[in-house]
Amino acid sequence: MGQNLLIDYCISDGDTEESRKCARELISLKPDVLFAVTNTSMASLQAEGSNIPTVFAMVSDPIGMRYVETFARPGRNVTGFTAFVPSLGGKWVSLLKEIAPQIERIGVVYNPELGNNSAAFLASIKAVAQTSGVVSVETPHGDSSSIERLIVSLQDTRNAGLVFLPDALTAARRKEMTALVAKCRLPAIYFLRLFCDVGGLVSYGVNLNKIYAGAASYVDRILRGANPADLPVQAPTEFEFIINRNTARVLGLELPESLLARADEVIE
């Protein structure tokens, strides 16, 4: 790319085994810096024992996974940008309840792998669900087939909805996921606007372009000689609220103007 930069990449679509293969392949190339986009890819690089400087972009719990010592002083050859904070779990529940007030039961779709920090999100969800009169049902998954079964199992449940927790697999399969959710006529909230772009009802999360731009700046600084241990991990400070109004109409949801006014973007 350009005259002095070569980029090699490998796509695993959230599959753990494929991610491990990608990690081994990229490490074998001995690059000057590695870039991990998701929890799964970062966990794979760590599992392979890489000592190559690494920047991550979407890791949920870098301290808990021992990628870094602290946000301010990573202390190792890894740094980057987190995209999620545990309190988002409760925010997703409250927004979904506001958009679809009839909801009484919420299925929480999540990947139980440690790197996804699902336990922290679930604790936040439970706390808000209890005060909102909503029953939250934890629905862990291991692959796309199990996610599909979970979604279908809720379609006959009265006043049910879905919360999708951060996960590389559901992001990679977002077209199939949102299509099935729509077929089952379930209100759902997602962690990235990518889902709303393909028919998802609502999302609340970071702006990916800003996260990637920040991560790219760290890659540039490392290539110019900076030590990852001295580059602080950056936590998100801004979140975007996206509503797909067309999907709301299909579901028969009447969205109040006050809610639409708060959205960063309304997709018609």
Where are these predicted regions, by residue range?
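Short hydrophobic alpha-helices and adjacent helix-cap/hinge residues
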Residues: M1-E268
